[in-house]
């Protein structure tokens, strides 16, 4: 999958609701509840614990030194009443770097990752997200989810705790929900790590 990061100028052209969601640095489901005017629920599509982190670029972002086991979690955020699919997300979580209570809650409930982390009171730092327009993740179609568009705005960020990366989260904002997104011309996107939305 090729990722062409969006410049600040391209991000400012996105629909207001989508800009709010991209800029959200807290619990995405809380913001999405307001933007979508619906109770947002988590549907776990698939999750798996890897005893050793696979050789994938996303796993490498967790760091190779003593990463231990990794929980790979695919989820959909959707409206309870509308049943609209809002976000498709993948999380890679270094579970040996977190308390067992967090892992138990993640693997035995449908609670949103952000809510689980907020309730744990663990001090974390969310790195600045990289934003791009790209293909929807392949796992979405493999599990029977269809979307009228094949591309979406996405963001990826790492969460750090105790000086170590504990998770990498990739979120795809499903374009059929956000109506006035930019034209899909991937060759126009400029590379940028800066997402300065508040000016």
Curated annotation (Swiss-Prot):
Gene3D superfamilies: Chorismate lyase-like. Inhibited by 4-hydroxybenzoate, but not by pyruvate. Optimum pH is 7.5. Active from pH 6.8 to 10. GO terms for molecular function: chorismate lyase activity. It catalyses: chorismate = 4-hydroxybenzoate + pyruvate. Pfam families: Rv2949c-like. Keywords: Lyase. Its EC number is 4.1.3.40. GO terms for biological process: chorismate metabolic process; DIM/DIP cell wall layer assembly; monocarboxylic acid biosynthetic process. Was identified as a high-confidence drug target. Removes the pyruvyl group from chorismate to provide 4-hydroxybenzoate (4HB). Involved in the synthesis of glycosylated p-hydroxybenzoic acid methyl esters (p-HBADs) and phenolic glycolipids (PGL) that play important roles in the pathogenesis of mycobacterial infections. Belongs to the chorismate pyruvate-lyase type 2 family. This is Chorismate pyruvate-lyase. It comes from Mycobacterium tuberculosis (strain ATCC 25618 / H37Rv).
């Amino acid at each position: 999958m090729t990722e062409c990061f969006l410049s600040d100028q391209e991000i400012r052209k996105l629909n207001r609701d989508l800009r709010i969601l991209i800029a959200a640095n807290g619990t995405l489901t809380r913001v999405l509840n307001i933007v979508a005017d619906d109770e947002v629920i988590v549907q776990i599509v698939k999750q798996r614990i890897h005893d050793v982190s696979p050789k994938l670029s996303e796993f490498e972002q967790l760091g190779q030194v003593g990463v231990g086991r990794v929980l790979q979690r695919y989820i959909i955020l959707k409206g309870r009443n509308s049943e609209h699919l809002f976000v498709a997300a993948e999380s890679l979580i270094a579970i040996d770097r977190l308390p067992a209570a967090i892992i138990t809650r993640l693997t035995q409930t449908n609670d949103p990752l952000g809510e689980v982390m907020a309730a744990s009171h663990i001090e974390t730092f969310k790195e600045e997200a990289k934003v791009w327009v790209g293909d929807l993740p392949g796992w979405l179609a493999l599990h029977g989810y269809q979307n009228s568009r094949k591309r979406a705005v996405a963001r990826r960020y790492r969460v750090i705790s105790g000086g170590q990366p504990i998770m990498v989260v990739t979120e795809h904002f499903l374009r059929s929900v956000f109506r006035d997104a930019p034209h899909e011309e991937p060759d126009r996107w400029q590379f940028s790590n800066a997402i300065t939305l508040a000016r």
